[in-house]
Swiss-Prot record:
PANTHER family named in the record: PCI DOMAIN-CONTAINING PROTEIN 2, UNCHARACTERIZED PROTEASOME COMPONENT REGION PCI-CONTAINING
Residue ranges annotated for the PCI domain, each copy included: 233-444
Keyword Manganese found: no
Record text on subunit structure and interactions: Component of a COP9 signalosome-like (CSN) complex.
Protein name: COP9 signalosome complex subunit 12
Gene: CSN12
Organism: Candida glabrata (strain ATCC 2001 / BCRC 20586 / JCM 3761 / NBRC 0622 / NRRL Y-65 / CBS 138)
Organism domain of life: Eukaryota
UniProt keyword Ribonucleoprotein, yes or no: no
Gene Ontology CC annotations of this record: COP9 signalosome; cytoplasm
Length: 449
């Protein structure tokens, strides 16, 4: 029985005669004798002869139904009282230990047999259930206790990852290596919650060394073919890591482009899609190979995609050169950008937004090589007036104060232009005495988008 057909039956609980025969054979084979530790005698018999629901329940939570039910019935306010909180904490730990014990048994079964590729997805199901259980019950735990359970959970999941990674079976149909991505996604999710950059780096190095981060090779991965959501999650974490931590924006936008192109249209209003498109827009702008004036979506769009994309304020600022609104955007969301790891990227985009303003003024000036700073200041003031609020309104008509304000603005523009020249985004030089910029006649904006 093919792996893909097995997974399909397993997910839908559509148990054909072929599926029952397949599971029955696996249960009776010598390498999988440890299944008796999971199933009781009568349950094993039922699972072997047709009651496959018993097998599924055993793999996922057969020993934990009562504990899980009691946890669901808990009053969330019970965590307020310390004595009840201790009881809840102990119950969560007991359930977690039972779940991880089941997972360790399954890992042994998975490791002992070369032909147990069929068990990869059920093991992932248990890992996913453990991680979901920890996230759902986190409100009952103190921060330190929660982190300890997360770290223990990561170790058990990593064991499943290494079993799949170390499979040397030359028959690719029976090789478990393709399942590494399933477990890697769970690990990266925990590392993100723990904000453990070093462990994320180590895991991605392993994935890079085996070629799993190569987008062209992902097309041949049967797990990613079967589970499109896993492909989206995997490339999201990889793209986020390359962009937020390594500042390799070309690689980052390539992985996020896969996420955008694979994302189901009916879910484009979800926070996941908004998060992906936000990162994709940032990194596409900063990718050195991108020389488009504005970022295009990588595939034919429909109304939902277009709406989700065009509503992005950052992209509008980039297209219009609206430095005022963009500065306000950074100030308003600075804390969130720091948490997400995108603050540095936003500062780099701020430079591009200002560059866009300079280029618009250059075109308005008929592309002459001498560009007065007063013209750039005029463009700056247009956005300044459009962004009308109490803070930005000019409250004085005193000529001296207005002159001082104008001089301060020109000084600020000089500094920002000098920064662009130093970074190679503008080819030219500043004339401080003439308050103008002299641009190259052949290539004034060598790295401009």
């Amino acid at each position: 029985m093919e792996y893909s057909r097995f997974v399909d039956c397993f997910e839908r609980r559509s148990y054909t005669a072929e599926f029952l025969e397949f599971v029955g054979f696996k249960l009776s084979s010598e390498p999988l004798g440890a299944t008796a530790l999971i199933l009781g005698g009568s349950q094993a018999k039922q699972a072997r002869y047709g009651d496959v629901n018993a097998l599924y329940d055993a793999i996922v939570q057969i020993k934990l139904k009562e504990s899980l039910t009691s946890l669901r019935e808990l009053d969330p306010n019970a965590a307020v009282k310390k004595n009840k909180q201790r009881k809840v904490h102990q119950r969560v730990v007991d359930v977690f230990q039972a779940l991880t014990n089941e997972l360790r048994i399954l890992n042994k079964i998975l490791e002992r047999s070369d032909d147990s590729v069929w068990l990869v997805y059920p093991v992932y199901t248990v890992c996913h259930d453990v991680s979901t259980f920890l996230r759902d019950t986190g409100k009952y735990m103190q921060l330190e206790s929660r982190k300890q359970l997360w770290e223990e959970c990561i170790r058990v999941i990593h064991r499943s990852f290494m079993i799949c990674l170390n499979d040397k079976n030359p028959n690719m149909q029976e090789n478990k290596r393709g399942g590494c991505i399933l477990f890697a996604n769970l690990e990266m999710m925990f590392y993100k919650m723990l904000r453990n950059r070093d462990m994320m780096k180590n895991l991605i190095k392993v994935l890079e060394s085996t070629g799993m981060t190569d987008i062209s090779r992902q097309r041949d991965n049967k797990v990613l073919k079967r589970h499109r959501s896993q492909k989206i999650i995997f490339n999201y974490f990889i793209g986020e890591y390359y962009g937020c931590y390594l500042f390799q924006f070309n690689k980052a936008q390539e992985h996020l482009q896969v996420c955008v192109s694979e994302f189901p249209v009916k879910y484009t209003s979800s926070k996941w899609f908004k998060r992906i498109i936000h990162l994709y827009t940032q990194f596409r702008m900063l990718a050195t190979s991108n020389k488009l004036i504005h970022v295009e979506l990588p595939r034919e769009t429909n109304e939902k995609f277009a709406n989700a994309y065009d509503s992005d304020l950052m992209n509008k600022c980039y297209k219009n050169g609206d430095t005022i609104v963009f500065d306000e955007l950074i100030k308003e969301h600075a804390a969130q950008y720091l948490i997400d790891g995108t603050y540095s990227a936003m500062l780099l985009i701020k430079e591009l937004v200002f560059l866009r303003l300079v280029k618009v003024c250059y075109k308005v000036n008929d592309k002459k090589s001498i560009l007065p700073l007063d013209l750039i200041a005029a463009g700056y003031r247009i956005h300044f007036r459009n962004h009308d609020n109490e803070e930005n309104r000019v409250t004085t008509t005193n000529p001296r104060k207005l002159q001082k304000k104008n001089e301060d603005l020109l000084d600020e523009l000089e500094c920002r232009i000098a920064n662009l020249i130093a970074n190679g985004r503008i080819k030219g030089y500043l004339s401080h005495s003439q308050r103008c910029m002299v641009l190259s006649k052949t290539e004034p904006f060598p790295l401009a988008s």
